[in-house]
Amino acid sequence: MTSRALYSTRSQLCRHLAHKYLSRSYSTRPSLNEVVIVSAVRTPIGSFKGSLSTLPATKLGSIAIKGAIDKAGIPVEEVKEVYMGNVLQAGEGQAPTRQALLGAGLPLSTPATTINKVCASGMKSIMLASQSLMCGHQDVMVAGGMESMSQVPYIMAREAPPYGGVKMEDLIVKDGLTDVYNKFHMGNCAENTAKNSSISREEQDAFAIKSYTLSKAAWESGILAKEVVPVSIPQRGKPDVVVKEDEEYRKVDFSKVPKLKAVFLKENGTVTAANASTLNDGAAALVLMTADAAQRLNVTPLAKIVAFADAAVAPIDFPIAPAFAVPKVLKAAGIKKEDIAMWEINEAFSVVVLANIKMLDIDPDRVNINGGAVSLGHPIGMSGARIVGHMVHNLKSGQYGLAGICNGGGGASSIVIQKF
């Protein structure tokens, strides 16, 4: 071979290797997996010290996780990891989600992580699981949330007082319902939002009555029953009591709603026990997987994860944080608010939903169409997962649903799904 021919051959080889190795680094980008929801269930929601109060959050979580896997129709061994939201963890024991998944019969080899983003914990669990599935770290996961507010303990300081009595603190209030920056109850933040947004007591009461009315109608029509798995409560020497229905929505007397005193502001206060959410017990869980895993397991997906986003504002303004998360998730999804057929904005307080409807300029008739936390209850680690699961069951084919939930500290999470 002549030197010229050898040079030509070497040049061709160099160009081939450059194309093979160098161009690959610059011309290709990894694609994310499509994530689908194949089941979504929840327990009934129990009233504070009510029907579910004897069961710890971890047991409620077990029931929801098992129910979701059973509905999906897949072997428990297929679940590679579990994320569950849980806020008030004191006294539950180590690794609450680990307890919940083992109680649901999952293998000892299944990893678990507990998520605490206050009221957004259940939704954030879904978001984090979706990220893991999108990136290919796992292919089948369970995500949701659980809370037993009835079993939250009181605490006292470890130091012995030099003189006088011992002060006990309620961890529901301290860890769940107090703005740590302003040193007051979340209800005071709601009052601040009502004032700044010019939302009256009458508007909040009307919204609460509507929430109770819608929840009652949804139960009577069977809409809510399809997302609920029964809970059996063991009894001493008697048959188990089976709880199949939410407890809170029946506990209302509409004639008393306008007569109740404001709870947080004595003068010109607007937030009452009726137009705020209640303390509750319950759990929700969803089975998520990649589209490839759904095909492999011969599972029919119900909906797909389109996009999700978080936002943060001043802690006192937490009630309006969803109004900042929603534009971000719409942009990420590449759609407009007019494309959303169903909105779920968590009813921590009636004023939360009213303020966000006003700020986002959305149709109130598409928001919380079957009631919400004011009437159904708000187990704080569960609610974010509950509202996502509710959309899964109630959207029609091809429709988009958007759920948003505020959280203490001045935050919110939001998610868009599309029904198959």
UniProtKB/Swiss-Prot annotation:
Catalytic activity: 2 acetyl-CoA = acetoacetyl-CoA + CoA; propanoyl-CoA + acetyl-CoA = 2-methyl-3-oxobutanoyl-CoA + CoA
GO CC, any one term: mitochondrion
Main localization of the protein described in the UniProt heading: mitochondrion
SUPFAM superfamilies: Thiolase-like (SSF53901)
Transit peptide as recorded in UniProt: 1-26
GO biological process: fatty acid beta-oxidation
Increases nucleophilicity of active site Cys, annotated site positions: H378
Active site as annotated: C119, C406
GO MF annotation terms: acetyl-CoA C-acetyltransferase activity; metal ion binding
Enzyme class: transferase
Function: This is one of the enzymes that catalyzes the last step of the mitochondrial beta-oxidation pathway, an aerobic process breaking down fatty acids into acetyl-CoA. Using free coenzyme A/CoA, catalyzes the thiolytic cleavage of medium- to long-chain 3-oxoacyl-CoAs into acetyl-CoA and a fatty acyl-CoA shortened by two carbon atoms. The activity of the enzyme is reversible and it can also catalyze the condensation of two acetyl-CoA molecules into acetoacetyl-CoA. Thereby, it plays a major role in ketone body metabolism.
Name of the protein in its database record: Acetyl-CoA acetyltransferase, mitochondrial
Lineage per the UniProt record: Eukaryota, Metazoa, Chordata, Craniata, Vertebrata
Gene designation: acat1
